[in-house]
Design a protein with these regions (language model features):
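Phosphate-group recognition and catalysis centered on beta-loop-alpha active-site segments
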Residues: 1-247
Length: 247
C-alpha cells in the first residue's frame, strides 16, 4: 500500500507556513500533496493564510478581510519563523497555484470560516482553480459547510471534504459526505485511532478518509496499519523519515 503524504501548510516545519517557500519546499522534498489555507481580502483577492488575526505571523493587528492585497503585500510573513525568512510575503492563491502546477497529487484547500464570501468571490476562487487546470486535483474543505455547498453549486465537479473533530460527529459527517458525492472525510487522526472500524464503514459508502495532523512516527505507523492511505503532516516528509516508505 502506498501512502499519500500531504504537507500541512506546505513544509511548515522547515519554512514559514503557507508561504511560497514552504509550498515549494514540500514539492522539493517530494510530498505527494499539499494542504494550505485560503482567505479573502477586503478587495476580494483569495490569499493563502491560516489565522483570523494577522498578529502571530506578521506582528500586525487586524484581519485578512480588513486589508487590501496591496496592504497585505507590505507585511513580513517570514521573520516570526526565522530571521533568514525576512521578506517572505503572504501569497495570493493565484501565485500559490502557479507555484504548485507541477505537483502530481492533490491540493487540499482549507477555506477558513473567518469571513463571509460573496457569490462573486466564490466564483473568483473556482475560476483561479480552473484557469490553473487544477480542478481535477483540488479538494475543498471548510468548517463553513454552507460555503462548501455554494462551491459545489458553482462547480458540480469539485471535490469536497467534510471535517471531523470528535467521534460524535462521525455519523453525521459521513452521511453528509456520502450525500454530497465526490467527497472525503477529513478527520483529526486520534478519532480514527480510537474508532478504527469506521475506516471500512466509511469506504463502504464510497467515502475515503484523510487524517490530520500526524507528526509522530508511531501514530503514522498505527494509522497505516489500520489502512489509512492519506496523511497530513507538518514534518514527516522527504528525508524527515518516511516519504520513501511504502507499506
Amino acid at each position: 500500500m502506498s501512502v499519500e503524504i500531504i504537507a500541512h501548510r506546505g513544509f511548515s516545519s522547515i519554512a514559514p507556513e503557507n508561504t511560497l517557500t514552504a509550498l515549494l519546499a514540500a514539492i522539493y522534498n517530494q510530498a505527494n500533496s499539499i494542504e494550505f489555507d485560503v482567505q479573502i481580502t477586503a478587495d476580494s483577492v483569495p490569499v493563502v493564510f491560516h489565522d483570523k488575526s494577522l498578529n502571530r505571523i506578521t506582528g500586525t493587528p487586524g484581519t485578512i478581510r480588513e486589508k487590501t492585497i496591496s496592504e497585505l503585500k507590505e507585511l513580513d510573513a517570514g521573520t516570526w519563523f526565522a530571521e533568514s525568512y525576512r521578506g517572505e510575503r503572504i501569497p495570493t492563491l493565484e501565485e500559490a497555484l502557479a507555484a504548485l502546477k507541477s505537483i502530481k497529487g492533490w491540493l487540499y484547500f482549507d477555506i477558513k470560516p473567518h469571513a463571509i464570501w460573496s457569490d462573486l468571490e466564490i466564483k473568483t476562487l473556482l475560476g483561479l482553480i480552473q484557469e490553473a487546470n487544477l480542478g481535477d486535483r483540488t479538494i475543498l474543505t471548510s468548517f463553513d459547510e454552507d460555503l462548501l455547498w455554494q462551491c459545489r453549486q458553482s462547480d458540480p465537479q469539485i471535490k469536497l471534504g467534510y471535517f471531523v473533530v470528535n467521534a460524535s460527529q462521525l455519523p453525521q459527517q459521513i452521511s453528509k459526505a456520502e450525500a454530497a458525492g465526490n467527497a472525503i472525510l477529513s478527520s483529526q487522526y486520534q478519532v480514527i485511532l480510537d474508532q478504527p472500524s469506521i475506516i471500512q464503514e466509511t469506504r463502504n459508502k464510497g467515502v475515503d478518509i484523510v487524517v490530520w495532523t500526524v507528526d509522530k512516527i508511531i501514530d503514522f505507523e498505527r494509522l497505516v496499519d489500520l489502512g489509512i492511505e492519506r496523511i497530513i503532516t507538518n514534518c514527516l516528509i522527504g528525508d524527515n523519515v518516511i516519504k520513501n516508505i511504502t507499506y
